[in-house]
């Protein structure tokens, strides 16, 4: 489609075609995350959960996500990932440049911190207790 062609053209114009991969659909997401260094979730509409941000962090990958919806709650800016102003391409491009110029050890550390964050927030015991507490609140 026209938008995709425009994105390809921009990648060529800025000489980053070899560094950017556009994926339409993927059957093996674990592998896709594994071979990636940085994940971008550029949602312009709030997602209730922000699954891409959670998946990326669980795979110890740096996530760059818009600061709305679930991503805003699961990504700790500058610690477990990078948040940008939703709908602001300049904010997104600054975060991408920050990630691309980041020291490899910091990139790794942020990935590890992201996984710790997700495991802490979304372990089965905590989620069950949270669900139980909500049901209890609704019943009373």
What spans do the regions from the language model cover?
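Short acidic alpha-helix that forms the nucleotide-activated donor recognition element
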Residues: 22-36, 58, 76
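Short hydrophobic beta-strand element within catalytic cores of glycosyltransferases
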Residues: 62-65, 75
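Conserved acidic donor-binding segment of nucleotide-sugar-dependent glycosyltransferases
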Residues: 77-78, 82-89, 98-104
């Amino acid at each position: 489609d026209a938008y995709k062609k425009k994105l390809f053209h921009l990648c060529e114009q800025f000489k980053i075609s070899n560094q950017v991969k556009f994926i339409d659909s993927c059957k093996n997401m674990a592998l896709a995350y594994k071979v990636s260094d940085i994940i971008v979730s550029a949602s312009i509409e709030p997602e209730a959960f922000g699954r891409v941000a959670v998946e990326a962090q669980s795979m110890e990958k740096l996530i760059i996500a818009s600061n709305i919806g679930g991503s805003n709650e699961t990504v700790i800016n500058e610690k477990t990932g990078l948040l940008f102003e939703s709908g602001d391409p300049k904010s997104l491009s600054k975060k991408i440049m920050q990630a691309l110029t980041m020291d490899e050890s910091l990139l790794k550390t942020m990935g590890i911190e992201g996984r710790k964050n997700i495991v802490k927030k979304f372990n089965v015991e905590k989620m069950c207790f949270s669900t139980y507490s909500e049901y209890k609140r609704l019943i009373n």
